[in-house]
Amino acid sequence: MEICDYPSKCLVQNPVGKNKEIKMRRLGWFVGWILLNISSHIATSPTSWALDKSVDRQGIDARVLQKPPYNLTGKNVFIGQVELSRPTRFAVDKISNKLLQIDRAIVQPYEVFFRDGKAIPNKNLDDHSAQVAAVIISQDKIRRGIAPDAKLLSSAYSQRRQDGQPEACLAAQYVARQYNSTVRAINFSFGELLSEDPRPKPLLDGNALLTLCVDWVSNNYNTLPIVAGNQGKGGIPIPTDLYNGFTVGFTREVDGIYRQVDRGNLIDEPFIDRNDNGKYDQGEVFSDLNKDGKWTAGVESPIDGRRSLALLAPGNNLKLPTLQSKFKNVNGSSFAAPHVIGTIALLHEYANRQVEAGNWSIDARRHELIKAILINSADKIQDQGDGKILGMSKTILDAFGKTWIDTEAYTSRNIPLSRHLGAGQLNAHRAFLQYQAGQQLPTSPENKSLENIKAIGWDTNIVEVDKYQDYIFAKSLEADSYISATLTWDRQVKLNDKNGNGLFDIGESFTDEGFNKLELYLMRSQDTDISQSIWSSVSQVDNLQHIFIKIPTTDKYKLRVVFKSPQKNSPSQRYGLAWWAKS
């Protein structure tokens, strides 16, 4: 069984789901990073094309966007990929030229790099990176990628045992700077070891060099970082504690539909649920991964109860090509994350059309907005056909069969995301409908009674400290229907630029400048004080707020974005807001 082409310690999920470590040695040295694919093996008698399922209605429902009338394929949209290694590129790598004719190449990145320069021919190649890329840009007729015409820029960063966070940062920065900084999103399907972080007593507090770097790159170059979630026995959580992008977990099929969290995701310490109540009880057998003698929830999650896992996507039983274009079954969050990247490429292709036609401004390309769009349109509970659950296509389950309604996020104003489910599973079609609804502006200071927003829409705007922005629905919202609303904004990170060149260089560092305190309220349109709110999302540890709640009575409502003092950095805060309701 081939695990990964890199000399590494890899996590393997065998057919009965147990994890074991395999240590591989090459050239007398070890690499301590773990690729986030849990398994891969050659498929001999496939019964279905799992990638096609994961991209179609059984998964994220992106195929409909590739067909008329939309015809979205990611054309002319730049997206990035950073990993230890990279896919092959025809005319760069002899192995690619030898094995394939150009018309048979399934995965062809637009450009390939090594850290902050050109790729080294025939070096730093592996199957894992090719399989991640295939989810996005596969040209196979049956197993077509989500955005086959997107321009993928892929960079490898690791060549020696000591290569790690600084080198990965160089690669991310270099990718983001390409083509006048028009790379819309970057995929990170790898993790760095927390145990090797050089900080004293390192924590998942967002302050690892690579995590700071990823957030700085996002804010500085207007790109959305998407990170594969931690899994297996863990140990590789950096940069899953990022703020300005988000982390993706993976789902498995239930009766042919991707809709349940795979147990391979590392969220809580695994345990045997003897009484089948979906929670750990004293005395139940568990895996003590952190060796503290007690069961731990969120064992390798960000500190202070913060949840960076925002979305789920299919990642189990996918059939993806190797460097030799042989298809293998693979599982893991590594392959869930690029489902999000591919969807982003489709959205940006649509945005390009709208901008070129003069219908939208370039603000529609803001990464905060795309983040809000994706999260707000996720599937939670299947709609029954009356639109009261906003047309959601699937009920998403945690590993114990519980839904989002059963989570602490549903009942707490302080917790925007479920620890196990995030905001739900990616739905590319719903994300498109959310985006297509277009920008709608808040009530103007000149006319505070203006009721102007539709049931579905978005905005990207600025709010000043100690001020607020009101979004008043033009029509009454229907009782017992749900409303979903998501607010996102960036934390600020400063580059400690020793040589003043405006770029991160090896030996330099970053400083966390924190994030301002924004809150999101659902109110009746006539009410003026937030104490009168119907519901709110007021997390104190997140730069994201998310509301999903039933409308109590048919009435006029509004959303209010509030910037509370004291300011953490700038007195003006850019944000992205998306909403979906039934009127």
Model-derived features: where do they sit?
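Secreted peptidase-domain scaffold signal
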Residues: 392-516, 574-583
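Subtilisin-like serine protease catalytic core
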Residues: 51-55, 64-167, 180-185, 195-198, ...
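Gly/Ser-rich catalytic serine loop of serine hydrolases
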Residues: 121-133, 206, 326-342
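Extracellular S/T/G-rich loop segment that most often corresponds to the catalytic His/Ser-adjacent loop
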Residues: 83, 239-349
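Bacterial N-terminal signal peptides
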Residues: 31-41
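Hydrolase catalytic cores
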Residues: 157, 313-405
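Calcium-binding acidic motifs and repeat modules
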Residues: 263-298, 508, 518-521, 536-539, ...
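C-terminal edge strands of extracellular/lumenal beta-sandwich accessory domains
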Residues: 366-367, 371, 471, 502-513, ...
